[in-house]
Amino acid sequence: GTPYYRVGDQVLVLATPMVRRRDSLFVPLQFLTEVLPQRFVQRYHYDGRRAHFTEIAGTGSVQHAGTLPNGLLPGHVVTIDPGHGGSAPGNPGKFFPKGIMEKHVTLQIGLLVRDELESRGVAVRMTRITDVRAPLLERAPMCSDECDLFVSLHVDALPSTRHNYRSISGFHTIIIGEESSADANRVARMENESLRYEIEDGPAAAADALAFILKDLSRNEYFLESASAAHLIQTHLAKIHSGENLGVRQHNRLAVLNTAQRPAVLVEMGYATNRQDAQLMQSRSGQRKIAGALADAIVQYLIEYDHKVGAGALSGAGR
């Protein structure tokens, strides 16, 4: 059996494999409770509280009482994490203006994402709103029970020793998972660099901290939701980004995600070592485009989640 299935040109994954026995195909319960209600919103509905699946008569769309004008149920909370900050500047930004580094760009875009989401009825928590170093291991836990999604914003950069490093552009989103690649390992080493500013009590404390953050969370119950949010982010960024859509990647040793208690993604918005990417990320017009695309993706994710859990379930925080 295989856990993969195709919707249009997208290949998606189920929690467990499908099984074929003679002339019958057995699919995970998740296909009934999540996939059908999400992909065929007007036809199927699943009430998570009552564990009740229904097929909707007719072709009219399901209307939820109390929805916002954009179709979102009220009460959602999202945590935005502008990567790095303070004494942890991130990458220096080869093609950013002099004095501008990753920590500045992530904060500028993060604040714009906050404004976009709040204007659409989503409450936002920020891990930082000024140029300060928020402890890496305390960022994701800010999105706990009363939060729907954690989004960490970052800027990628390639080493000058890599062939044609300036010509490589694009964006990708990382979630916790097993399918680590050499490039994902490179990103993890770069983004985990902030830890060296935080482990100050000697080798023993460092070993304990690293053992905690490097633990295998591939069984994270929020893997599928994180993957859904990540794919939507890639889809919406592709509409405004001139670089290559590098897709959704997995890694199980990325500190800021390994401490997540809710669905969580890390977005590499472009390469500071590419002139076009850098211009998009540091210009005010480019930042607004990125922020708008991220907000579009987040709102779509929340709306789809509302449909999956059902109109009878409580909306927003604390689900």
Task: Locate predicted features.
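A structural motif
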Residues: 75, 177-215
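Extracytoplasmic/secreted envelope proteins and their assembly/folding machinery
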Residues: 29, 33, 107-114, 137-140, ...
